[in-house]
């Protein structure tokens, strides 16, 4: 059973490039170095919003154990870095999904 931890981010147009850079150059390499995820997917959310841009970051965990390690040790630390960089300009919510086999 694989678990997917999906975080959706919404930012103003002016800082979208900064968020993309931070996710690609810091967040994803940091997670990959920990060896917990079997796949990572970073995408633009296709919606017609009047303001801002939305992105989805999906971390796929091969086991519940790896997922729990991420949640307990790394989740708040990584999100904290993004909040420190973008402050109240960063809206986010997360959902945990279970793959149906």
Report the location of each language-model feature.
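Short, well-ordered beta-strand segments in beta-rich or mixed alpha/beta enzyme
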Residues: 2-9, 42-73
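Short amphipathic alpha-helical segments
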Residues: 15-42, 77-81
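Surface-exposed beta-strand edges and their flanking turn/coil or helix-capping segments
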Residues: 18-22, 34, 54-57, 70-72, ...
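Glycine-rich beta-strand-turn "strand-cap" elements at beta-sheet edges
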Residues: 38-52, 80-101
């Amino acid at each position: 059973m694989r678990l997917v931890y999906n975080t959706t981010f919404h930012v103003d147009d002016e800082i979208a490039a900064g968020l993309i850079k931070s996710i690609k150059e810091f967040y994803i390499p940091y997670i990959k170095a920990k060896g917990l995820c079997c796949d990572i997917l970073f995408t633009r959310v296709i919606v017609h919003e009047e303001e801002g841009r939305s992105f989805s970051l999906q971390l796929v965990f091969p086991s519940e154990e790896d997922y729990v390690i991420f949640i307990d040790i790394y989740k708040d630390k990584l999100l904290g870095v993004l909040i420190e960089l973008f402050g109240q300009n960063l809206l986010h919510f997360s959902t945990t999904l279970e793959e149906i086999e």
